[in-house]
Amino acid sequence: MIEYRKDYFSDARTDGLTEVGVTRQRSDVLGHVTGKTQYYADRHFAGLLHLKMVRSPHHHARIKSIDVSRALKVPGVVRVLTAKDVPQNIYTILCLIQVEPNDEPVLAFDKVRFKGEQIVAVLAESEQAALAGVAKVKVVYEELPAVFDVEEALKPGAPLVNEYHGRNWFTYEGHHCRRVRFGNVDEGFAAADHVIEEMYQSSPIEHAPTETTGCIVVPDQNERYTCYSNTQALYFTLDNSALILNSPFHKLRLVGGTVGGGFGGKVDVITEPIAFLAAMLTRRPVKYEYSRAEEMQVSSPRAAERIYIKDGVAKDGRILARQVRLYVDAGAYSRHSPYGTTKAAAHMPGPYTIPNVWVDCHCVYTNRTPSSAMRGFGVTIGDFALEVQMDKLARLIGMDPMEFRILNAYRDGDMKAHQKEVDGAALVECVQAASDLANWPIAGRYRAMSSQKREG
Amino acid sequence: MTKKRGRGMASVNYPTGMNLGGDPSQALIHATTTGSFIVTLSSVDLGQGLKTVMAQICAETLGVSTENVIIDTADTDTGPHCMGTFASRGTHRIGNAIIMAAKEAKSVLLEVAAEELEVDAGDLETDGAGNIRVKGSPQKSIAILNVALAAHFKHGRTISGRGIFLQPRSYPEPETGKMTPATCYAHACTVAEVEVDTETGEVQVLSLKSAYEVGRALNPRMVEQQIIGGAWMGLSHALYETTEPYYPNRAHGPTDFNQYLMPGPGDLPEFSNVIIERPAGDGPFGAKGVGEMTANSPIPAIANAIFDAVGVRVDSLPITPEKVLRGIQALAHDPEKWTPVFRKDHAQTEDAARH
């Protein structure tokens, strides 16, 4: 059931639109429901090679030696790729927006920093032969102590996860975390009737697309290479691949646009650079596709977060101060997590006007699968923590949870903690509409409030 | 066995776009000889319906029907740059680029039509049905098909347009965090109703009732599709999903959908939704990005409803039956105690050892 509440903001909308504001059937839906949509994997190329990865069985280990000789003897195995074959082996995805340092190898060579990290690519005439080749690659490891807890990782003496950072956290312009400072939280806590501090925690979450991440790269004429990919961002993939391959940009072409579920999981650039490289070195089409197990345990999940929220609230329901310490578990490499951590900081203290806000958001490296973008990146888990905290605060002071939200909700013209004036607010109206929809009564004072005026 | 019901709510907002790195997207539009309009992009449709909404935005701006617009996308040899489909940016950023391109194409279209009709271009309008007519005297009109033919074969004009939307990069101030991380914000509020089995700790979500403020719903059924799909994901995050069930312990990671749990059709609640539209000044026809937000408010609403039902706070995701049951048992021992169930040392050792 869906209903439009046209009574809200009725003077803000222009009429006379004919093509937007009306339902049109999705252009791809018939193909999807009849199974006729062509995804990248539906393309077939003569001479296709299959790429399978040798992956780390350890969370953290030094690589003592890699022996591929027995793999090369497996019938159907055409060649193997190691770090030595990758022109610019160390990269980071967000170097395109000047995020530093490059901190991740395309293929691991001196160390592995998480279980499942890719080390050797095996190219073969069939998937079966490629997997048989993978089983024959001998890697000798020396296991190293690993760290899995974000707060343990920040302590002195913790195992160092990523040497390119030199410490277990991302550095933001000289700071060990992304900070937000607005007002004075100590004064806010002193003036509050109640102060509570609570801790929230999430675990990594998989995007779980129907179609796993993958691509096929095909050598064209004229030394160009076309990559058929299910990436969510063609140019991100093209530009990063060219940098990793040390290739002129014009030699690479990305074709995509039909994706069997993204949710942020196909924003990383993992399968394409190595498939490009394999196609360049073999002059044959190459397919690199994650298995379901790789999709779940090797491809980046949503970051686990640990969030401490300390609030000072007055008896009348106003939140006077909010202090947030947030830890994003980036896993072994940056990928998109430094960005998501900043996004998390900007999101605090939620859609409420609080005069005193103090936020420290830490992007922390641990020996687990690198986390990266996922739907609601930097916000979803923060909202879980904030809104459970809001429920606790409302109950603590004996206020209705809806009225408590409406009282504190930001209004047009208010100043946010990241010093941006609120514009186009509509939280008050959403809470009011939800109270109607769910038959959850609120008092007349709160019914009369709006996002444009604090009181009615 | 007792089943207890509870109700909880949560309200959230969500930013459109990701301009902490600069946030551009481009569109090119041209008319064919027969008056169809091709929009060329390199943007990716993830299955959310981007291509359909982009065609609608182009059609509305040009004043033609959506059927006459063809979206040609996702080839870097032909399509101009797009940052990508993420950060709830597609509708807003690419939509704005298309409006800019369509305005330029439309101005050429009207200029050619003006020559054909021997009137001033400023006096012309599209009728939305494939014709261009003189304002106030609709009998004086010309089919867009004929305008396009004339442009190609008689006037030597390209009916085309270029569009870009760029939200310039914001650099956060290191000391204070002063920044402009996004553009407009969408809003939501969800009320969840749950039933908790006090013997097994299992939670059944009975209903999710939500209000969403989306700026402008450009395609109402696709908005509905987004918000129900998103609410499903929120429910799934709240109660089921993780790749590391005993985080931060790395053991017992699922590798397939037998082990990685998600709600099935029988676990779906009743969905009721209300849409509110407060158009964004910078959005295409006022639209805001809502793709990501729709998963967010159900999660805390469900957590709060569980507390309302059985008095147990589970402050760690996912809220599994095991955690709920432990909370219920702890409460039975000490009803005065208000205890978050999660303890990291506990999760790391005892729970993992038990399995």
Region locations from a protein language model:
Chain B
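Short, aliphatic-rich beta-strand segments
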Residues: 36-41, 205-207
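Conserved beta-alpha junction segments in alpha/beta enzyme cores
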Residues: 8-33, 41, 48, 184
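Conserved strand-to-helix beginnings and helix N-cap segments that scaffold or border functional pockets
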Residues: 51-52
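Short, intrinsically disordered C-terminal tails of secreted or membrane-associated proteins
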Residues: 351-354
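Short linear segments in intrinsically disordered or otherwise low-structure-confidence regions
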Residues: 334, 347-348
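C-terminal catalytic domains of large/alpha subunits in multi-subunit enzymes
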Residues: 1-14, 56-331
